[in-house]
Amino acid sequence: MPKPGILKSKSMFCVIYRSSKRDQTYLYVEKKDDFSRVPEELMKGFGQPQLAMILPLDGRKKLVNADIEKVKQALTEQGYYLQLPPPPEDLLKQHLSVMGQKTDDTNK
């Protein structure tokens, strides 16, 4: 039984590791140094995991490039969540899009 004044937390935690082989690639697992549910091939491609942080998934802190609900679901169902880098910006496409809009505006 918990001591008075101490709340028993039902908060889910995750441990986040940075890939040693792939830039901006992170692996989330439920327990520190427990990769037992992560496929072997994924671990080979990920390289030596480098501890980045331990994070409560209670919603108090936002994840930068991941949806907290998807992370929780993946941890529960498969035991890990893999965060890949965002797609590279296509600056040429953005420029052409802006130029096309400017051309359309001047033709009106």
UniProtKB/Swiss-Prot annotation:
<dbReference type="InterPro" id="IPR027354">
    <property type="entry name" value="YcgL_dom"/>
</dbReference>
<protein>
    <recommendedName>
        <fullName>Protein YcgL</fullName>
    </recommendedName>
</protein>
<dbReference type="Pfam" id="PF05166">
    <property type="entry name" value="YcgL"/>
</dbReference>
<feature type="domain" description="YcgL">
    <location>
        <begin position="12"/>
        <end position="96"/>
    </location>
</feature>
<dbReference type="InterPro" id="IPR038068">
    <property type="entry name" value="YcgL-like_sf"/>
</dbReference>
